[in-house]
Design a protein with these regions (language model features):
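Extracytoplasmic/peripheral linker and loop segments enriched in polar/acidic and small residues
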Residues: 129-132, 220-234, 259-325, 347
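Gly/Pro-rich hinge or "lid" segments in bacterial periplasmic/extracellular proteins
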Residues: 2-64, 177-178, 182, 346
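Long beta-strand-rich cores associated with HINT superfamily self-processing modules
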Residues: 321-347
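Ligand-site clamp/hinge motif
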Residues: 21, 51-97, 214, 223-225
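Structural transition elements
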Residues: 136, 153-186, 201-206
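Periplasmic-binding protein-like
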Residues: 94-97, 122-163, 208-209, 305-310
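Ligand/substrate-recognition segments at binding pockets and active sites
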Residues: 40, 164, 181, 185-250, ...
């Protein structure tokens, strides 16, 4: 079912066998451009195939991607001064400044891009009542407004988005602090719990979301210390920390996200979640072509994760970015793919 989508997805870069698995300057490919310069951490330059590209175009002679670093203000300044024609992606902390630039246009699209506060099966998280309490203690809509200015959709703690074709709409999952406190007491924590969450400082919306959740958890007796780690350091330990806030990119099918993140023993199963009934239903869903039949199975999978799962999921992001109004043919893709062969720049 997911094979065509997997072939199109960003982790599956298909290389020419003659190049021994190395992607480098001059590598052979099927795209409209060839990589001619590659300075890691600085820039890439791609030169157009003219003529003869099978997909139409390209209209530009070359594309240049520039790494402006982690400072959000640097990208805003570069776009405002027309040092660059557009941004690959924009962060919520840049939004106000970018909207004030008169010569740029905003593009956005709803996606299955998210981040989850996930736990591993160590105390106190090994008791599902604690995990349930963490979910009931938050108001996802408030966090969406604080962390992402309402650009997106509320999360429902099951990692299946309304943009997925097999999404099953469950009853709204609403905040209930009294229930969260009761669940903690039943789990042996009448005075609450003290834990630490690891997260990244960038993109800024992730830290904003964590800070908002921490304030809400506090009301239920869930006291959380925030350990902000540089992104490079976080990705070294993202599958090891007991409690972390991890970003997950858009996947076009819900079964793809669930298989990557929650199937027992999976290499990206950072929470180490293992539920035989969940695995059985997921395998069944992956083999069900009819979307309505698959949606019925997905409803059961979503319910399992809301009840037993290892995540608190506050938001689904809308992806947005800004381009100079001179840029023609640009469309924002949920996976942030850039169709360079469709682009042009008005002289």
């Amino acid at each position: 079912l997911a094979v065509p989508e997997q072939l199109f997805h960003y982790p599956l870069l298909i290389l020419d066998p003659a190049e021994n698995g190395e992607f480098k300057v001059g590598s052979n490919g099927t795209g409209a451009f060839t990589l001619v310069e590659n300075e890691v951490g600085r820039r890439q330059v791609l030169k157009a195939h003219k003529p003869g590209y099978w997909g139409g175009g390209p209209n530009l002679d070359q594309l240049e991607f520039i790494d402006l670093g982690d400072d959000p203000a640097a990208a805003v300044s570069a776009l405002a001064s027309r040092q660059v024609d557009g941004l690959y992606g924009a962060d919520i902390v840049q939004l106000d400044a970018l909207q004030k630039i008169p010569h740029v246009q905003m593009y956005q699209v709803p996606t299955a891009y998210t981040a989850t506060a996930r736990v591993q099966p160590v105390k106190p998280f090994d008791d599902k009542r604690v995990r349930q309490a963490m979910r009931y203690a938050i108001d996802a809509n408030t966090i969406l407004q604080i962390a992402h200015r309402g650009l997106g959709q509320v999360g429902e703690h099951h990692h299946v988005s309304a943009v997925h074709p097999e999404y099953a709409k469950l009853a709204p999952f609403t905040r209930d602090v009294a229930r969260a406190k009761r669940l903690l007491a039943e789990a042996g924590h009448p005075g609450g719990i003290d834990v630490e969450i690891a997260c990244r400082p960038q993109p800024g919306w992730e830290l904003l979301a964590v800070q908002a959740m921490v304030e809400q958890w506090k009301e239920a007796g869930i006291r959380v210390k925030i350990n902000v780690m540089p992104s490079t350091q976080y990705w070294e330990v993202w599958t090891k920390v007991p409690f972390g806030f991890t970003t997950w990119a858009h996947r076009p099918l819900g079964v793809m996200s669930l298989a990557l993140a929650y199937r027992s023993g999976g290499p990206w199963n950072e929470s180490r979640y293992s539920n035989p009934e969940f695995d059985r239903l997921l395998t069944q869903a992956e083999g069900t072509l009819d979307v309505n039949s698959r949606r019925e199975i997905m409803a059961r999978l979503e319910t399992i994760l809301q009840d037993d799962g290892p995540i608190v999921q506050p938001v689904w992001r809308a992806i947005f970015t800004f381009q100079d109004k001179r840029v023609l043919g640009f469309k924002v893709h949920p996976s942030l793919y850039i169709s360079g062969h469709q682009l042009a720049v008005q002289s």
